Regions:
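Structural motif
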Residues: 4, 85-87
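N-terminal glycine-rich anion-binding loop in soluble enzyme alpha/beta folds
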Residues: 4-77
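Anionic group-transfer/hydrolysis microenvironments
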Residues: 10, 92, 134
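Mixed-charge interfacial surface used for oligomerization/domain docking
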Residues: 14, 18, 23-24, 96, ...
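Short, conserved catalytic or adaptor-binding loops enriched in Gly and charged residues
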Residues: 17, 116-124
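Hydrophobic residues at beta-strand termini and immediately following loops
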Residues: 26-28, 89, 131
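Short, charged beta->alpha transition segments
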Residues: 68-80, 115-118, 239-240
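Short Gly/Thr/Asp-enriched flexible loops that form oxyanion-binding sites at enzyme active sites
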Residues: 90-118
Length: 264
């Protein structure tokens, strides 16, 4: 039984890790200043994209989920023909239509996969599950890494699905935003009003960098620091302490909106 894992391009994992484990990336459409781009998680194109300055302030950027039909076609062409069981983990459904569209596409695929599978020379039935990761970015990457570990243990498909779904409620995330005002404006376009104008203004005026902590994609400020480096040190110390205490999976997932020079 060959099991495949599908994640969308919002999932933050190292490119080489994704290639090594044969992850299938479900693309996301980015619309920037009226121009459409397809994010397929290619590291070279992503680097060029950031260096172009299109994601800097002053540009209007939004992401759009692939449609049900687009996802259906990808599943039929790339998944049904290669795997016997597939798990698709999406960014949290509260922030995107990917989960909804992928679920509809899955239902259509499961009702019509026989011809495509036979043409590819694969015997037996095909089964699939779309799972709401309840995460964004690094949290989604952690779930994917843990899922690959479970796949490696060759669990029965029902047990695999149960373990993955149970793990989605056990992921905690720390976020260090550099610019609360910018994050507030981006969030407001999605209808998220969790960051008030006063908080964003004070954060910028007083050079306060908060640490946001929470389960999944939901979080609250738990610390306020006077600069970014102090916030990073606090989070790294906390992460190291949790590793020492023992984790449910042998992975920690880290996403950085930094250049390699800044990271080094």
């Amino acid at each position: 039984m060959r099991v495949g894992l599908i994640v969308d391009s919002a999932c933050d994992l190292p490119y080489e890790f994704s290639r090594k484990h044969d992850l299938f990336i479900l693309p996301v459409t980015a619309v920037i200043d009226g121009q459409t781009y397809i994010d397929e998680h290619d590291p070279v194109r992503t680097q060029e994209f950031y260096q172009s300055g299109l994601l800097q302030k002053g540009h209007h950027a939004e992401t759009q989920a692939f449609t049900e039909d687009q996802i259906h076609d990808l599943f039929m062409e790339k998944i049904v023909t290669q795997f016997d069981v597939a798990i698709c983990e999406t960014v949290t459904r509260s922030r995107s239509l990917i989960f909804e569209n992928a679920t509809k596409a899955m239902n259509s695929v499961l009702a019509n996969y026989e011809k495509a599978r036979a043409a590819a020379g694969r015997d037996g039935k095909f089964s699939m599950r779309v799972i709401d990761s309840k995460q964004i970015f690094a949290g989604q990457g952690l779930l994917a890494a843990h899922t690959l570990k479970l796949i490696g243990q060759k669990l029965p498909k029902n047990a695999l699905r149960h373990e993955v779904e149970a793990f989605t409620d056990k992921i905690y995330t720390c976020v260090i935003p550099r610019d609360l005002h910018y994050i507030r404006e981006r969030a407001r376009r999605r209808g998220d009003k969790s960051i008030s104008a006063v908080v964003a203004f004070l954060g910028k005026a007083l050079n306060i960098t908060p640490v946001i902590f929470g389960q999944g994609a939901e979080g609250q400020p738990v610390a306020k620091t006077r600069n970014f480096d102090v916030a990073v040190e606090k989070v790294m110390n906390y992460a190291a302490a949790r590793v020492d205490a023992g984790l449910l999976t042998p992975y920690v997932s880290l996403s950085c909106g930094l250049t390699w020079t800044e990271i080094e």
